Amino acid sequence: MTLLASISSIGNVKSISKSNNFSSLSNSSLQSSNSIQCGGCGGGSPLIGTVGNLVGGVLVGTGIIVGTVVGTVNGVVGGLLSGPNCGCH
């Protein structure tokens, strides 16, 4: 039973790592599109956008979907703080 359980757990680990790789690729493409859409802000918001993109990039590197959410939220907040000519387009 122990050998069967360990083989089963190895199979589960392989399937989890495959799904993490796929989500990491999709998150990377989403993060890069967020960087392009939310860029070009004036005033103090480029710093906020840069911090959001760096945090998002680090989290995406680990395969966590939260990275994209953090980048998007920081892009929107940066747009609101900078005025009407800035934000995600």
Curated annotation (Swiss-Prot):
Pfam families: Coiled. It comes from the Eukaryota. GO terms for biological process: sorocarp development. InterPro entries: HssA/B-related. Belongs to the hssA/B family. This is HssA/B-like protein 16. It comes from Dictyostelium discoideum (Social amoeba). The gene is hssl16.
